[in-house]
Amino acid sequence: MRTANEYEIAIFKKEYCKNGEVRISIGKDFEVDVESFEELLPGKIVSSYATGNRDIENSFIMFRVCDVIKDIQYFPVFSETVGRKMLKSWNKPVPKKRSIFIEDNNGVGRGNGGTGNGNKNNVENSKLRSLILFARSLMILHINDPQPMNGMLKEIYEKLELHPYWNVRNYEVKAVNTAIGSFLRKDINVQNENFQNLQDYILYLQTNVTGRRLRNTNFDTLRNIMRTEYPAEQVYF
């Protein structure tokens, strides 16, 4: 199934995103799932599919909308408030919010899409998920129209989240490291802050984001896991 082009997205916005009533009809006319529910950096803004490309702050919900007849998929983005209303109307649950920040109560027991990871997860499993979330945050730092998470990162993240006791493999850490390195060489990074590695980005966050607690940023054990099999690999985190 191919992803919609700009023209098809414009038509989709016009026909299905102009108000609450037509947004609800998305669930009737297409197959719909939540692609991601993500918290943004303080002050970070992304564009909504809602009429007028309204700015979204704080967090967004991205859907995967499949037109099975035309074999086209869309990834509309809405504010958390709008997205929650859509999910409620379709009787669909709100998934966990992905965030590089730690809430005071960690979202445990809220039952409404909190960020809690449970009580006794595999430590490296949790750290690799955190690493992926920091990588994702970096990759959309200067993006106004976010696209789905990098396919390999998404696959690994969802596996780790589904199986919190899964023992992290060295090739999984290497795949995340490779994705980070690939992004760092892209123009969108080079022409802005030009971070040389993920630690540069974490330092940027520690300097520029106040009043929020970051997830654990000590990834030493993950580096060691990767180096046991790939000692010559350049580390980007």
Residue ranges and their predicted role:
Residues 1-237:
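Extended, alpha-helix-rich binding/interface surfaces that flank or overlap catalytic cores
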